[in-house]
């Protein structure tokens, strides 16, 4: 997609070198927006393969209000493993090798990388096999799904923001309050990772549903391709339920950054030419957005260039 490649190019040419929480370092810009017409095809990278089923299972995980990586691992989705693993290795229950700064060390030390990978595999297996262990160390805190589906009020009640949003689109589509927030300041200290994609708003006009996302922190190479596809999919799912066509997905970013250890991968991607976008295929079976399974969602005509691997910064 040209919009995304333009973002990569802009940050490479105009970004500012900054330090960051992970110690990796970034090239960053502040305030950037992309627009995608969802009528023109499903917005997923074609200049590198994005594993769409991982996008699907993560979004369904959010929709279920789940915050435990066990569901993700059951669907061969490893994208949240590092944050749960980090919590485990910092606990008194962990008795293995020192895992301090495991992400950076694994990138720089091949011997340590083997040790880390072995510990991670043991951790994943135990999450899948031991329910009590999973309940304790698979939890990531009150992240996205919890805030979307079960926001706790000061009175101790809960708000299902997503269900309320869908009902409001049906009954008051002209509302300017079609908003869901994952940013709950009270819960931030107890989250494995505070929400990067923190707030989204829907807009209805001319029989079409559009979505705008505000993302406070945008990992351009690894995270943003997932975010674009995830919120485009969410827009399609909600539009189906409320009887509207899809309009635009607008992606507004605060700190949009390229990690310093992703620069060569970005240059490789920029050398490639975008292909035709695929079409989203949804099963007619699910009655509501909350009834979808991974098998109910697929892409037709997705023929991307090969994947480009890059390290994740934790």
UniProtKB/Swiss-Prot annotation:
It catalyses: dUMP + (6R)-5,10-methylene-5,6,7,8-tetrahydrofolate = 7,8-dihydrofolate + dTMP. DUMP binds at residues 21, 176-177, 216-219, 227, 257-259. Pathway: Pyrimidine metabolism; dTTP biosynthesis. GO terms for cellular component: cytosol. (6R)-5,10-methylene-5,6,7,8-tetrahydrofolate binds at residues 219, 313. GO terms for biological process: dTMP biosynthetic process; dTTP biosynthetic process; methylation. Pfam families: Thymidylat_synt. It comes from the Bacteria. Gene3D superfamilies: Thymidylate synthase/dCMP hydroxymethylase domain. Coiled coil: none annotated. Keywords: Cytoplasm, Methyltransferase, Nucleotide biosynthesis, Transferase. It is found in: Cytoplasm. GO terms for molecular function: thymidylate synthase activity. Belongs to the thymidylate synthase family. Bacterial-type ThyA subfamily. This is Thymidylate synthase. The lineage of its organism: Bacteria, Bacillati, Bacillota, Bacilli, Bacillales. The gene is thyA.
